[in-house]
């Protein structure tokens, strides 16, 4: 089976989500040699890389360039909207190049990658219930895209029963689609 994981958050300073992505991907690679894993950094790679980790030995010129570009965008918030539109168009183009059996989106909002099944992790809904805890640009993006894109998911994983309950109430979807991991 061909499985793709969105690893774009690994190009930035690692947060809780970034660390979760990195460790989950590493564990899958070690525990599951039967499937073929792809990692999406804005390009598809069969290598798990994490430029933000000082111990990462598999960095390359492309990942370093993307890490630098992501840092530039982070330092210039006024560009984020324009860059986000360009990224969205690029993801749609890249999505047409490959198709996967499973797409795992570990960061709330699935991209337009082509896969037979989509699994998305929602860690919490604080962006809805506590927007003051989040950067302004995230609060501008999440409400616009979350509900529409999460609907693409065949399965939604939540970090807790509490978050699962919030998802079921908010999204009004079948209970069998939302699971706690």
Feature roles, as predicted:
Residues 1-181:
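Carbohydrate transferase catalytic cores enriched for Leloir-type hexosyltransferases
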């Amino acid at each position: 089976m061909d499985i793709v994981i969105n690893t774009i958050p690994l190009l930035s300073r690692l947060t809780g989500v970034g660390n979760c992505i990195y460790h989950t991907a590493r564990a899958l690679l070690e525990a599951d040699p039967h499937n073929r894993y792809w990692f999406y950094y804005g390009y598809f790679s069969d290598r798990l890389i994490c430029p933000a980790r000082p111990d990462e030995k598999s960095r390359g010129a492309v990942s370093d360039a993307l890490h630098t570009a992501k840092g530039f965008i982070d330092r210039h918030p006024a560009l984020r909207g324009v860059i986000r539109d360009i990224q969205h168009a690029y993801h749609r183009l890249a999505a047409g190049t490959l198709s996967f059996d499973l797409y795992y989106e570990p960061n709330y909002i699935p991209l337009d990658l082509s896969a037979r099944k989509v699994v998305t992790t929602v860690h919490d809904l604080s962006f809805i219930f506590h927007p003051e805890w989040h950067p302004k640009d995230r609060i501008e993006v999440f409400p616009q895209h979350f509900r529409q894109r999460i609907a693409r998911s065949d399965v939604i994983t939540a970090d807790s029963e509490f978050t699962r309950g919030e998802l079921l109430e908010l999204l009004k979807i079948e209970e069998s689609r939302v699971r706690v991991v």
